[in-house]
A protein has these predicted regions:
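Conserved ABC ATPase "signature" region
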Residues: 83, 123, 135-153, 260-264
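P-loop NTP-binding/switch modules centered on Walker-like glycine-rich loops
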Residues: 184, 188, 192, 196-274
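Short catalytic/signature loops enriched in Gly
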Residues: 9-10, 155, 245-333
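A short, proline-enriched helix->beta-strand linker immediately N-terminal to the Walker B motif
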Residues: 177-181
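Conserved ABC transporter NBD signature motif
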Residues: 72-83
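Conserved ABC ATPase signature
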Residues: 158-162, 166
Length: 333
């Protein structure tokens, strides 16, 4: 969650993070003062539209931003109490895949078409556990493939011989073979049909319990979050605008207007309306940080102060909302 007092329980702690892309035309402000923390074993959903800053945040944690263009301008990223910003490449190489793994949106960006799937899972294990014997490594590879639902008899096949859902299973095997403490899953089910999507989410849930890993699930789909996560952080224009448990996000009458808009975009056969209600307008231009609330131009409740004054974060029972709507509530209390 964005503000957490029990620091010893936190596996990941991000404070006032600012990330930008320095292009030839302009500076793109992708993450703007973001705060986030994650406990050991927690399943956290990061929700927001394309361009909200979700993937940039994940790449920043692993220091995989595009070189020369991507830049962490300021802030802090601590992992298990240790500051990651400023760490040398050698340190981060040991961290990636071993303690923190990432599943990318397109499995083919992680798979080498010229190597068998067994070789690729084996290579990850060998990189982080070179002292294991070849037989020990092969046994672990076979077991991991079996855990993700791929028969060991197919480990000699190449990525193109597998369906999209099976490719994603292979990528999950590669991400978890070293038993990391944290898994960053970036839209792992986006390109899959509903049936396969449910299977992949169930697989991730089972493997999360098997290895006791914390998971950050990045998605634009609140329905997926409701199925998988314990807690949710809603991100808009590089900021956390709401954070709470799944129950708080969906059931509470108090919501950030952006969160309410996302929920209205979820198909629901019980509604009287025949059409979904998309959020009007577009994401704020990331080249220009607004003076007030970044959602003001799209908000149905926009007031004058929303355009001129940044909103404060309001908290109630751990439920956090960054919105002027709740200023009067707090003043009354």
């Amino acid at each position: 969650m964005p503000n957490e007092t029990h620091k010893d329980d936190n596996l990941l702690e991000i404070k006032d993070l600012h990330v930008q892309y320095n292009t030839d035309d302009a500076v793109v402000y992708a993450v703007n003062g973001l705060n986030l923390s994650l406990k050991k074993g927690e399943k956290l959903g990061l929700v927001g539209e394309t361009g909200a800053g979700k993937t940039t945040l994940a790449l920043s944690i692993l220091q995989l931003l595009p070189k020369k263009v991507g830049q962490i301008a300021s802030g802090s990223i601590k992992y298990d109490g240790e500051e990651l910003l400023g760490k040398p490449d050698s340190y981060m190489l040991g961290l990636r895949g071993r303690r923190i793994s990432m599943i990318f949106q397109d499995p083919m960006t992680s798979l080498n078409p010229t190597k068998t799937v067994g070789e690729q899972v084996y290579e990850v294990l060998h990189l982080h556990f070179p002292n294991l014997s070849k037989d020990q490594k092969q046994d672990k590879v076979d077991r991991m493939l079996q855990l993700v639902g791929i028969p060991a008899s197919r480990k000699g096949e190449y990525p193109h011989q597998f369906s999209g859902g099976m490719k994603q299973r292979i990528v999950i095997a590669m991400a978890l073979i070293a038993e990391p403490e944290l898994l960053l899953a970036d839209e792992p089910t986006t390109a899959l049909d509903v049936t396969i999507q449910a299977q992949i989410l169930e697989l991730m849930r089972r493997l999360k319990d098997e290895f006791n890993s914390a998971v950050v699930l990045i998605t634009h789909d609140l329905g997926v979050v409701a199925e998988f996560c314990d807690n949710v952080s809603v991100i808009y224009a590089g900021r956390v605008v709401e954070h709470g448990t799944v129950e708080q996000i969906f059931a509470s009458e108090e919501k950030h207007p952006y969160t309410a808009g996302l929920i209205n975009c979820i198909p629901d056969l019980t509604r009287d309306e025949k059409r979904l209600k998309p959020i009007p307008g577009h994401m704020a231009d990331p080249r220009h940080i607004p003076t007030g609330c970044c959602f003001a131009d799209r908000c149905p409740h926009c007031m004058e102060k929303c355009r001129n004054t940044p909103p404060a974060m309001h908290e109630k029972d751990g439920h956090l909302i960054l919105c002027h709507l709740y200023d009067t509530t707090k003043e009354a209390e």
